[in-house]
Amino acid sequence: MRAEIHEDVCRNGFDAELNCFVQAYGSKELDASLLLIASIGFLPANDPRVRATFEAVERNLLVDGLVQRYRTAGSEDGLPPGEGAFLACSFWLVDAYCLIGRVQEAEELFDRLLALRNDVGLLAEEYDPRQKRMLGNFPQAFSHISLVNTAHNLSRKEKPSEQRGR
């Protein structure tokens, strides 16, 4: 069953025209969760589809260097457009950079994310880089869990997906 699902996602979740995985079958939209493809071991980081997907996320979901979850304008989620960047998703980009060998960019983005913490080290769910303020739930455990995981990943010689399946 696992192999069938994997094959189905690779066949139907990858848009050949966009040259990347997409948010949902038949969609042309991206979602930051696509940054997890390699870190969870779904596909290796050196797979051309993974690299192309990471690059597509960078082109389409980065706002002032931080990652939006998805483009709210192209989405039918009932939320108004204009959310901030999701901090957990920005930590996922750090992990993705690590996995594809862009370690300096990973460290720079990680340092930038750390600098967003408040005076007692807390992070919100989102950050608005234009207004330079935290948004959403505060404090947000998901942001902090992502920070801890990413710090751990940056400190190891073996990167996240290399540990999967052991």
Residue ranges and their predicted role:
Residues 3-86, 108-159, 163-166:
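Extended glycan-interaction surfaces of carbohydrate-active proteins
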